[in-house]
Amino acid sequence: MAVGRKSLILSLLIQHFVLLHGAKILTVCFLGGSHYLWMDEISRILHNNGQEVTMFLQIADGLLPDYQMQESPYRLITWSLDKNYLKEFSEFFRDSKYNFKDCDELSSYLGLMTHFSRQCKMIFNQTSIMNLLKEEKYDLAVIDSFNPCTFLVSEKLGIPFIATHPFPVKSPWHSGIPNQLSYMPVYQSQLTDHMDFFERVKNVFMYIASAVLERKIYSLFDDVIEEHFPACSRPSFEELYKKTALWMYLTDFTIEFPHPFFPNVLYIGGVLAKPAKPVSEELEDFIAQSGEHGFIIVTFGSMVPSNPLTEFVKEMNDGFSKIPQKVIWRYRISEWPKVLQLAPNVKIMNWISQNDLLGHPKARLLVTHGGVNSIQEAIYHGVPMVAIPLFFDQFDNAVRIKAKHLGTFIPKDQLKAEKLANAIRDVIGGESYKNSAMHLSLIQRSQPFPKDQQIVRWVEHIVKVGGTDHLIPYSYQQPLYQQYLLDVFLFVCVCVIGACYLTVKLLKMFIQKLCSFRKLKQN
């Protein structure tokens, strides 16, 4: 009894020391672009609130071509891909960008996950780095779960972990989001929460297909698990999902359709959005020329800083020439097609401060690919959008933009100059779009607790209490047939059928007896 009391006191003293001096947090990021941006922001938030933060970062040319990493206030441990493989990986990204108009989304997604599995083997073979990370004895990891390898790294290091993801994962495995398929669209379904019968049928079949695809993706990592985990303790991804202390999704209900989620889920959409800073004098002079018409911002995210298809660029450039607004377009100047004359109202720039431009009082519209960070920043500043989705979740995001009356979208294979110009005119000229954007901005800005405070408080809570087992529902331990009461429905059906059968049998017996009695009476 005394030993147990001493252990409890020692545990409480350790937790008090950790909270007093800051927990040791490892953030894990193996992909650039917007993924790096939000992991960097989370790392800075935790560092600025007294945590001892280290980021385990994969650095590779081609992933962050235009983003110059600022000097990080937190510690960085980096690793890089083999030069020969890096060339192959960069070519994969380049091909995806060159062929985005006709690419097969499924094969492209599987191709990316195949590359992630190959990179995972390389990470685990970095024994000196892995040993260094293990010796640090981190209290908690925050991972970018879009790359499944981050789960395995955390498990190998023996660190409890928080998973971040760009959108809510509606999975048969446990990701904190119950699967209510009647009104919760499955990833890539391009549906809203208002589904008719055939749309619900589509949603169910896509859910089944996504479950099959998930198992296919996670099987790509079987070799890593078999090689680097003992046979007696090899984890499955289903187990790792269940072990996740907290799911943090880069969205919120300003853009997401309302739905339930478990207590171990936190929506942090808009964490990158900030009050705008003044733009450069050069940009201010250009914007001033727009007069009352204002200007629009055009950017296709950190992964597609320019567009290799001259036809696509020509349609956009021609479309912009038909509108009175000034246009600030993030596009690599060195890659502008020489055969095209830049429209007189367009200014192209290698890099733009999107958040600051969106917060400018003359900003009228954002033309976007539909990335989560761009959408959340536009909502924060109350700017409507025209989306031209290119990859993955961007198609679903574009549907949400339209459903929330934040703007409209144009399918990438239907982009024409006149169609783009008309869409811009309709959204800027339609007062209801601006009103919707301003209303959602108010919702996002007036939430009781800022996103950065929520992140900090949750991390402190998890470190203090040693996990979130108290928030995990029992459904995590139930098989699907119990979760959905299939056994109960089967039992009820058997009882009803049995009761009907017995009733019919009894009626037949009664009728036969009655008929026999009448015959006897007649005789």
Swiss-Prot record:
Keyword Lyase included in the entry's annotation? no
The coiled-coil segments of this chain are: none
Q: What keywords appear on the UniProt entry?
A: Glycoprotein, Glycosyltransferase, Membrane, Signal, Transferase, Transmembrane, Transmembrane helix
Q: Which residues lie on this side of the membrane: Cytoplasmic?
A: 505-523
Membrane topology, as annotated, equals: Single-pass type I membrane protein
What catalytic activity does the UniProt entry give for this protein? glucuronate acceptor + UDP-alpha-D-glucuronate = acceptor beta-D-glucuronoside + UDP + H(+)
Q: Which residues are glycosylated?
A: 125
Q: Does the keyword Glycoprotein apply?
A: yes
Query: Where, in residue ranges, is this chain on the Extracellular side?
Result: 24-483
Its biological purpose is as follows: UDP-glucuronosyltransferases catalyze phase II biotransformation reactions in which lipophilic substrates are conjugated with glucuronic acid to increase water solubility and enhance excretion. They are of major importance in the conjugation and subsequent elimination of potentially toxic xenobiotics and endogenous compounds.
Instruction: Write out the similarity annotation.
Output: Belongs to the UDP-glycosyltransferase family.
The protein's name is UDP-glucuronosyltransferase 3A1
> Which organism's genome codes for this protein?
Xenopus laevis
The record lists the lineage as: Eukaryota, Metazoa, Chordata, Craniata, Vertebrata
